[in-house]
């Protein structure tokens, strides 16, 4: 009976039985709720030279098993190699396979790919009962120390090999926290937030160098995917942050913390015609001698909306004049803008000098959780508040009615007692 009263009160106050469940829920990619305490449906094992991904066919925790053929790894669509049993699917892939991307940070080598569940209609039907899901996967290996089973024997590098060793530079592009002090712990964003990006080069024993972001492009899938469309330029024309020309306030940070580091912010966005909730940013990074004066080919320029002009991080202001009309040079980025992302690798390899002072680096995926002030959420909140107010009002009326009845019964009892005592 108590549970019935609780259910009645819950329905009265909350407006529906689905809100009466006290168990906390969280959302898997694709919007399917799963209890917090449940085991993870995707498990990753990072080995010395390969990764093993084990996927439960009950991917959404609903008891409905997904089809193994609907599961692939990476943009190459690597198929599962081993099926453990009827309820589990396993992928075995080398670290460099399945379109895996490698990124070098200060302390680690990061190999990243993604698990894709792309359901297809079965039995000639045109309906789907599960969602499309993209699960980011990362394997991190410490740069300091030995990850192999055999110890490395240190050796002296001959002098004639030292020059070539010193020419190797390590470029990186990382998502940072708002204070720029630490790397962002999770690549998740709401629309309306700002992404803090830090490009960096580790020079080692090289002569002092200054880093520049030549051009950056954003795509819903990793480059060089030939199907990367649509795309959006963030930086173009040898260092012009063109994304700041739109309604955003994207800009380079002034001053830069170190010559070998360049920081910039980008107002988060997503592609209107893309069903994916992910974003990849690929930047072409390059270096120049630290004592070289910035010019049209080596610059970092942001658009200032107040003055309606381009301003450099360092150097004379006139080096940014070409950003307004895009004729800084006949650069590979200009050709890239004409042909699109599918020509990225071909154009870069054809126009780039055959040296190690520039590189293409990708950060991602950036995962969108929806708008920070989503109208649907606001509408649900308003509806819930209305239901609660209505419920409280009805509960108050019921309480007052019950109190009136109790008071009336009490008075009647007192009156009856008085009448019975009169004959005495």
UniProtKB/Swiss-Prot annotation:
It is a single-pass type I membrane protein. It is found in: Cell membrane. GO terms for biological process: binding of sperm to zona pellucida; blastocyst formation; egg coat formation; humoral immune response mediated by circulating immunoglobulin; negative regulation of DNA-templated transcription; oocyte development; positive regulation of acrosomal vesicle exocytosis; positive regulation of acrosome reaction. The modification Pyrrolidone carboxylic acid is found at residue 23. GO terms for cellular component: collagen-containing extracellular matrix; egg coat; extracellular space; plasma membrane. Residues 1-22 form the signal peptide. Disulfide bonds join 46-139, 78-98, 216-283, 240-301. Proteolytically cleaved before the transmembrane segment to yield the secreted ectodomain incorporated in the zona pellucida. Changing residue 111 to F: Causes a mild reduction of protein solubility. Keywords: Cell membrane, Cleavage on pair of basic residues, Disulfide bond, Extracellular matrix, Glycoprotein, Membrane, Pyrrolidone carboxylic acid, Receptor, Secreted, Signal, Transmembrane, Transmembrane helix. The ZP domain is involved in the polymerization of the ZP proteins to form the zona pellucida. This is Zona pellucida sperm-binding protein 3. It comes from Mus musculus.
